Amino acid sequence: MVVSLKGRDLLCLQDYTPEEIWTILETAKMLKIWQKIGKPHRLLEGKTLAMIFQKPSTRTRVSFEVAMAHLGGHALYLNAQDLQLRRGETIADTARVLSRYVDAIMARVYDHKDVEDLAKYASVPVINGLSDFSHPCQALADYMTIWEKKGTIKGVKVVYVGDGNNVAHSLMIAGTKLGADVVVATPEGYEPDEKVIKWAEQNAAESGGSFELLHDPVKAVKDADVIYTDVWASMGQEAEAEERRKIFRPFQVNKDLVKHAKPDYMFMHCLPAHRGEEVTDDVIDSPNSVVWDEAENRLHAQKAVLALLLGGVKTGF
């Protein structure tokens, strides 16, 4: 199937078909191979990406900057102080102005509505680098990693343990679209958004995958192929951190919990990790951990997104 993504936004993976997600993953795989063998892939020569950061990040900034450099383009970093938003300029006007200068906008924001508004008023592709609702680039890197390591995504049991947050949302959406068996285990009251749960159930029915929401981490990770976790308190939730530590303690991924998974299970984490909280050193540093490969794949997945949305690659490989 010929799939063109030129000119599209990437705000949430629910907006993408399974075929479109596979186009991104296959393109990422090819670009990763080209990088390893030293084959030039300057597919976005002369293109510029504006990167808006309301929230700081190591992986997002570095991976997008390096991605544009590898593709022959340029990335422009803009933090909150660099923009006029704090002085009264609207997101709509910011989007309109940036669209006259750059070829795409990546935004890492607190409120998902901000990235939606950027996309509404920009005339160039807008990429969600993270919002409080979703983290699509992370999920693309996650499933690229699972595909590499397991040889498939369909039928793989992917278990997310912890807070039903933006990372959980994107993991649920992408996994159920691609036929994985996705299980989410959270404490009572910290479940994913009800809308995302419905999407996951609908996606699974269409793909042949499955989705299950539990509140028992031991039951959830039984025979897991992948165990995934994230921090218990995200940026902006610092005031809740102490209370969350108490509530989430039974959901720590440690050597006792992972005993219930398959012996060859993979441990995944979007990073940064709070060692000793959501995961212990003996898990994240174990041979089962693939977090560094997963972090690397942010680069390759985002190169694929950029190349496809900006037209450097027309239909994937």
Curated annotation (Swiss-Prot):
It catalyses: carbamoyl phosphate + L-ornithine = L-citrulline + phosphate + H(+). Keywords: Amino-acid biosynthesis, Arginine biosynthesis, Cytoplasm, Transferase. Coiled coil: none annotated. GO terms for molecular function: amino acid binding; ornithine carbamoyltransferase activity. Its EC number is 2.1.3.3. Pathway: Amino-acid biosynthesis; L-arginine biosynthesis; L-arginine from L-ornithine and carbamoyl phosphate: step 1/3. It is found in: Cytoplasm. GO terms for cellular component: cytoplasm. Gene3D superfamilies: Aspartate/ornithine carbamoyltransferase. Homododecamer. Reversibly catalyzes the transfer of the carbamoyl group from carbamoyl phosphate (CP) to the N(epsilon) atom of ornithine (ORN) to produce L-citrulline. HAMAP family: OTCase. Belongs to the aspartate/ornithine carbamoyltransferase superfamily. OTCase family. This is Ornithine carbamoyltransferase. It comes from Pyrococcus abyssi (strain GE5 / Orsay).
